[in-house]
């Protein structure tokens, strides 16, 4: 018997071609899940989430994996366009996805929603006010919806990550920079990036029956950079 068993589970992964998507799909598949990897844009089409779920068919797990490059803007230079664009990518899809998947999960009497978020919502970072606010909204949504749906056997949780190896936020050109390596040693107790597989295996655990007891939880995965 293995702790993480996803045999017979259908998992829908959004934005599966960027950020943690490839690693998540690979690890979930290796643990027996039937992975539906979707790559459509959820930010610009308000009906994309509904169409995505309709195309996927019944899903046991929604992995709400949303990413956008983080603006590096001084707070007094943040414009409305930047604010709206980041929230459109990271926050607006969540209620649309919930409307699309929750009714069927409720009818079946079980389901899971896992949001892949950011630890930037847990610890302040300079010049990231827009991005951190949007990531914080994701986590607040998870906590509220997790409590709302718990009695219906639908678990809603989040990973809040930073310093995890991925091509969107830590491409190879960043990782080889001596200044970045020095930053790792100074800021991250682990002293290295969390590997993509380490992160994906933890996500897989949260998608499994072994994690049925977690309700609206936010789990930092950041090598100790953030812990609350």
Predicted features by range, described:
Residues 112-137, 142-151, 163-164:
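Catalytic loop of short-chain dehydrogenase/reductase
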Residues 103, 147-151, 212:
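Alpha-helical segment proximal to the catalytic Tyr-Lys
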Residues 151, 163-187:
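A glycine/serine/threonine-rich, flexible loop-to-helix segment
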Residues 98-99, 143:
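A short, exposed helix-loop element centered on a Lys and neighboring polar residues
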Residues 3-36:
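Canonical Rossmann dinucleotide-binding motif of NAD(H)/NADP(H)-dependent dehydrogenases/reductases
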Residues 73-75, 79-87, 180, 184:
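Substrate-binding pocket helix/loop in short-chain dehydrogenase/reductase
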Residues 2, 123, 204, 215-228:
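Short C-terminal tail/terminal secondary-structure segment
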């Amino acid at each position: 018997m293995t702790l993480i068993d996803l045999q017979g589970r259908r998992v829908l992964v959004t934005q599966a071609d960027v950020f943690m998507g490839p690693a998540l799909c690979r690890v979930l598949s290796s643990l027996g899940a039937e992975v539906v990897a979707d790559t459509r844009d959820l930010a610009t089409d308000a009906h994309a989430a509904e169409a995505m779920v309709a195309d996927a068919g019944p899903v046991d797990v929604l992995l709400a994996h949303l990413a956008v490059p983080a603006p590096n803007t001084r707070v007094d230079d943040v414009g409305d366009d930047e604010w709206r664009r980041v929230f459109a990518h990271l926050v607006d899809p969540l209620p649309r996805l919930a409307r699309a998947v929750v009714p069927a999960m409720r009818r079946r009497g079980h389901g899971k929603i896992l949001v892949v978020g950011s630890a930037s919502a847990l610890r302040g970072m300079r010049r990231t006010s827009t991005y951190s606010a949007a990531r914080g909204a994701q986590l607040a949504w998870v906590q509220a919806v997790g409590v709302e749906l718990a009695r219906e056997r639908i678990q809603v949780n989040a990973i809040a990550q930073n310093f995890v190896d991925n091509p969107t936020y830590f491409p190879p050109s960043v990782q080889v920079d001596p200044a970045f390596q020095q930053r790792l040693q100074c800021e991250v107790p682990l002293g290295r990036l969390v590997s993509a597989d380490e992160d994906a295996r933890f996500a897989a655990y949260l998608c499994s029956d072994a994690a049925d007891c977690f309700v609206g939880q936010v789990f930092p995965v950041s090598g100790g950079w953030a812990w609350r």
